[in-house]
Amino acid sequence: MKERIHEYCHRLHLPVMAERWSAMAEYASTHNISYSEFLFRLLEAEIVEKQARSIQTLIKLSKLPYRKTIDTFDFTAQPSVDERRIRELLTLSFIDRKENILFLGPPGIGKTHLAISIGMEAIARGYKTYFITAHDLVNQLRRADQEGKLEKKLRVFVKPTVLIIDEMGYLKLDPNSAHYLFQVIARRYEHAPIILTSNKSFGEWGEIVGDSVLATAMLDRLLHHSIIFNLKGESYRLREKRLQEEKQKDQ
């Protein structure tokens, strides 16, 4: 009987139940646990494990460069960031409203950290999330276009519930390359949100993409439904270096 139960659990793709049912049945017997409670605990263990595996899969597929949470963000070092507004984003209501989130500001002040934190929360809630830099995005689409696979590659960036585009503006894009980015923005417009980080102001986007008309078209779609954060302050890395140098002087 035990072998058959084990076999049936695997055939039904219930590996946790296959592994734990015998021990849990013995525990239920010795602790006077009802049949329904026993079954509930088995099913609960299976669901918890499935959810954990699902989240790990989503993290792997997201291409996030590292894991960050909002709890590790130093709001005291970045007073320009409204913690209340950031934590409101963690409710993920922006997903239902199809609102984009834009983090603007100089390098090293936590834009990517904040974007990844929101992405991690989306993954924890079961939403497909994808991370890529603006430069890598256009390069991948250009290569796919040359290989006759543009539509297939576009779906990689259009399909996820949340798309994080990092480092917009760190490297200039030629107009042809920028057009690929525009296609992604246009296809996600009013369908699914983009979280974007940039070290450039909106007024500089024409220079970034080499085409002011194209830049205006991008911004028109990004900003129509959006939440914007303008971060200011000293770079974390420069701040740590300065504090370290000051500490060494005091010694």
From Swiss-Prot:
Residues binding ATP: G105, P106, P107, G108, I109, G110, K111, T112
GO biological-process terms attached to the record: DNA replication
Keywords (A to Z) from UniProt: ATP-binding, Nucleotide-binding, Transposable element
NCBIfam families: IS21_help_AAA
SMART domains on file: AAA (SM00382)
Transmembrane is among the record's keywords: no
Similarity comment: Belongs to the IS21/IS1162 putative ATP-binding protein family.
MF terms (GO), sorted A to Z: ATP binding; ATP hydrolysis activity
Protein's name in the database: Insertion sequence IS5376 putative ATP-binding protein
PANTHER family the record matches: ATP-BINDING PROTEIN RV3427C IN INSERTION SEQUENCE-RELATED, CHROMOSOMAL REPLICATION INITIATOR PROTEIN DNAA
